[in-house]
Amino acid sequence: MKTSWIKIFFQGMIHLYRWTISPLLGSPCRFFPSCSEYALVALKKHPLKRSLFLIANRLLKCGPWHIGGIDLVPGTSIEEYLESPDDKNVPPDQETV
């Protein structure tokens, strides 16, 4: 399946955010996977419109009004995230020693 240039653009913007802005914020994401990892997976697994809806919905949860926790992209399993080298934000009960 060919990735559209719009998806590639959004993926690039997410990576740019991860490399530039995210380190300056300092506080960890309240979710697993992190919001940026969630967005990358959503763009990979779903059509663009569905991905953007899922990403917007997730970002609207990001704040003190939501407890956070494990929130996976629909159609994925936690194993897919634990195997991903992109996300270092592993929930405490899933850490390996």
UniProtKB/Swiss-Prot annotation:
Subcellular location: Cell inner membrane
A single Gene Ontology CC term: plasma membrane
Transmembrane segments: none
PANTHER family tied to this protein: MEMBRANE PROTEIN INSERTION EFFICIENCY FACTOR-RELATED (PTHR33383:SF1)
Name recorded for this polypeptide: Putative membrane protein insertion efficiency factor
Family: Belongs to the UPF0161 family.
Membrane topology value: Peripheral membrane protein
Keywords: Cell inner membrane, Cell membrane, Membrane
